[in-house]
């Protein structure tokens, strides 16, 4: 039973899908995907449940959601174990993901009150009221890299606002969503308020094109996001929020400070989660000169020592595998392409079996036209530069705009950088992958459609309703010209 529709666990009627552990290729989950008819049933169940769910006082919805948060906290190790088995991420890291799910719930509750409040005021004898109302049925598309945390960051704000949800997780991490949906069921969520449909492209297309949805919250690749954007472009009646990737630049100033700290910040930016975070550094701009040379030497030395292994290894790894063998091959092919274009490998990424890839660092300074691609893995491109102005210009030479960073102890350099860089998340002397849960998460360009998630998800899970009210109709002291009563 792999789908949760209208409160019932049911089998799919579509093609068989499997979740393969990327570190040993074992099948960890198997089921049949949802057909178009089953997707329509899930949307219909959500529509039916919406009528009663939106009527519930906010406090009643909050009680259930906080009960879910308590269950997530209680089952942290179980959730983390499943995520590790599906994604290959180290167990220590997946435990932090489960913890982040709990933290995001508290943030979302606060955001609901701060971003979508009820307000009243008097003006010229009228009562002016601002209310917020749920959109209706929200389709949520989840990614594989944070299969618990990222869908949670859309589902919870949607439910708090009074919406109902149909979740379509990544076909590479179905088990995680199944485990989490069972916690929602245990928390006492009414039937149909959340529905789970598993499947690959066909299931996703059926959900995205379903007439019964009022909005779609997407986290995933830019290619898929752009397809959805084109699909929804003629349908202004549906809300679309896209959270996509980035070709993220990290600029190392000549005044980068202590070498070891700078190296640590680069490692955390480029290779955490085996490079499978949308905010990971993809391009590293390093100043020409002795200090930059020495920094790169040390960076390569440290990157060589990164422990890469399966998530539960006795020698605790920093990095796990890529999500799949195909994803691992993509990184190795990208490296080969950059080498063919004139790039020089400072540390060559290598296959370590199954979906494992070791860290790669390639000097792409001599590549005439650096491909503007998101290499979603442990491959860092280095470009040497003369001036900060040149570095910022190069950093902005991308269609993306998710994250960017500057490593510098010079305040004036930071002021210049933050003024001229084009990105939604901009950090100084901190890893690019660091972001506050109560700050907007998103960026311009191909990284999204200006609907950032996290704290700001409340903005597009409810629409504002403005009212001008009086206890009874009134006749003004002076009628409008040309009117007689």
From Swiss-Prot:
Substrates-to-products reaction catalysed: N-succinyl-L-glutamate 5-semialdehyde + NAD(+) + H2O = N-succinyl-L-glutamate + NADH + 2 H(+)
Pfam families xrefs: Aldedh
InterPro entries reported for this sequence: Ald_DH/histidinol_DH, Ald_DH_C, Ald_DH_CS_CYS, Ald_DH_CS_GLU, Ald_DH_N, Aldehyde_DH_dom, SuccinylGlu_semiald_DH_AstD
Residues binding NAD(+), per UniProt: 220-225
Gene Ontology biological process terms in this record: arginine catabolic process to glutamate; arginine catabolic process to succinate
Keyword annotations of the record: Arginine metabolism, NAD, Oxidoreductase
GO MF term (any one): succinylglutamate-semialdehyde dehydrogenase activity
Active site feature: 243, 278
CDD domains given in the database record: ALDH_SGSD_AstD
Pathway(s) this gene product operates in, as recorded in its UniProt entry: Amino-acid degradation; L-arginine degradation via AST pathway; L-glutamate and succinate from L-arginine: step 4/5
This enzyme's EC code(s): 1.2.1.71
Similarity field: Belongs to the aldehyde dehydrogenase family. AstD subfamily.
Function of the protein: Catalyzes the NAD-dependent reduction of succinylglutamate semialdehyde into succinylglutamate.
PANTHER family: ALDEHYDE DEHYDROGENASE-RELATED
Record protein name field: N-succinylglutamate 5-semialdehyde dehydrogenase
Source organism (scientific name): Aliivibrio salmonicida (strain LFI1238) (Vibrio salmonicida (strain LFI1238))
Source species taxonomy: Bacteria, Pseudomonadati, Pseudomonadota, Gammaproteobacteria, Vibrionales
Gene that specifies this protein: astD
